[in-house]
Structures are given as C-alpha cells and as structure tokens.
C-alpha cells in the first residue's frame, strides 16, 4: 500500500515529480482455508493498513484525492469497488474516493503506476494505491470470466494459462527443471534472510483481530527449509493442465 504525492500545489502543470511517501503491507500467509489470515475479511486487512498510514503520518485523510486498488478477483467480499469499501471501513473522510482495477497479476503494480501518472500529470496531489487479494477467502478464478469459463472463446483466442506459458518459455529458452528449482530455492533463502534480519519490519503491519490480539506479525509461509532434493521430488504444478491440451 503506497502513499504517493507531489511537491507542487499547481493544477495541471506540464510535469510534476511523483514521490512514494510511505509504503506498508500486511504479513503474507498461505492463501488457503488453513492459512493464518483466513479468518480476516479483505476489507479488514486493507483497513488496518489505511489506519496505520493515517497514524504514522499524522494524515488528514480529507487531503487524499483518490484511492486506487488492484484486485484480480473483484467478487464477493472483494467486490463492489473494494477500494471505496476499505476507505469507509477505515473510517477515513467521507470525501475520499476509491476505484478498483484489474490487470491480473499486475493489478497492484498497475494501481501504483496509475497513481504516479495522475500525480505527475497534476490531476491529483495525494493518492493511496496498492493491491489486495485474500485468496484464502476468495480463491483464484472466483470471478469466472470468458478466458476460463467460455470454451468457445478460449479456443478462438488461443488462451493459455500462465503456468503453461511459463513452462513453454522455459522449454524454448533452455531452462532445465534444475535451473528453475535452484532459482526458487535461492528466492526462498533470500526471503527468509530478509525476514529474519528484520529488513522490512518497518513496512510490515501486524494483523490483529477485533479484540486487538495479533493474528500474524511476520510472513509465515516462507519455505526456508527447502532443499534441491525436496524441490526435485515435487510434481510439476501444471502437469495435469498440460494433459488437458493447453
């Protein structure tokens, strides 16, 4: 979740510089029903971060021009313009607007990019932007859509799931299973090292229940104990999809 503003009070100048003033996130957990954050609604995850931004920056929220939130599955608890729902849930000023956008896995990044572009253009001065996805409560694919749910469209458009696409690219470019397993292992080691050394503690906001008890304080789904042998024993994630003809 980012707080983005500029150093100009002029409206619609040729060019402003957009600054990331602050950035926070929740700890990450497993996106399944047995994940640590399963009991927490998406709007509560978001509201906790919004309140943290407000408190640590002594922010008068009436100065916030807009809130932009990326969300891949904007349905159910994540539907109905979740950006505005989080604003209201956090108790921010009623004048603060909100918009939700979807660019699949790049939704949160697109939200930040859009906020930066609006600030740089002079359209807005202060925006909160980020992404939200609570996959333990709103699983991937919950929102349906033509690509996965309309066979005629999927065949006509040549739809290929992301995992199959990644496997295909790896094959074309000559990456072996051992190559990508080694990359994954190094990623897990670096994530564990960063967490254990507290490198991102200032940005990670603990998640609390309605009584103020901490549910999750640090990322708990990093596989620090992974080994090449262990990874090598896992089945290919998209093997069955490949058998179906993708």
Regions found by a protein language model. Name each.
Residues 1-13:
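Short, Lys/Arg-enriched N-terminal segments with co-localized hydrophobic residues
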Residues 120-173:
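Flexible glycine-/small-residue-enriched beta->alpha junction loops
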Residues 15, 24-27, 38-48, 56-58, ...:
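N-terminal extracellular/periplasmic Venus flytrap/periplasmic-binding protein-like
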Residues 3, 60-61, 65, 120-121, ...:
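Structural alpha/beta core scaffold segments of enzyme domains
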Residues 12-90, 97, 105, 168-177, ...:
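Conserved active-site "lid/cap" helical segment
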Residues 101-132, 170-200:
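Active-site-proximal alpha-helical scaffold in enzymes
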Residues 29-30, 79, 109-114, 133-139:
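Short glycine/serine/threonine-rich phosphate/pyrophosphate-binding segments
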Residues 71-125, 156-164, 228, 232-246:
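Conserved catalytic cysteine-centered active-site region
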């Amino acid at each position: 979740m980012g707080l983005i503003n500029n150093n100009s009070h002029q409206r619609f100048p040729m060019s402003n510089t957009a600054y990331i003033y602050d950035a926070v996130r929740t700890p990450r957990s497993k996106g399944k029903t047995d994940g640590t954050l399963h009991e927490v609604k998406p709007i509560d995850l978001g509201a906790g971060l919004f309140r943290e931004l407000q408190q640590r920056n002594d922010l008068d929220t009436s100065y916030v021009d807009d809130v932009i939130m990326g969300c891949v599955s904007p349905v159910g608890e994540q539907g109905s313009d979740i950006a505005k729902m989080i604003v209201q849930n956090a108790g921010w000023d009623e004048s603060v607007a909100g918009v939700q956008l979807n660019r699949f896995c790049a939704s949160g990044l697109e939200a930040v990019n859009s906020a930066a572009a609006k600030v740089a253009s002079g359209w807005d001065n202060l925006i909160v932007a980020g992404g939200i996805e609570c996959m333990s409560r709103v699983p991937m694919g919950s929102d349906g859509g033509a690509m996965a749910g309309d066979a005629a469209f999927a065949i006509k458009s040549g739809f290929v799931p992301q995992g199959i696409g990644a496997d295909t690219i790896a094959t074309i470019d000559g990456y072996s299973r051992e190559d990508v397993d080694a990359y994954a292992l190094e990623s897990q080691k670096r994530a564990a090292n960063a967490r254990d050394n507290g490198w991102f503690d200032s940005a990670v906001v603990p998640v609390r229940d309605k009584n103020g008890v901490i549910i999750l304080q640090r990322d708990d789904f990093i596989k620090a104990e992974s080994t090449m042998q262990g990874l090598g024993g896992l089945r290919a994630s998209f093997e069955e999809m490949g058998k179906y003809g993708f």
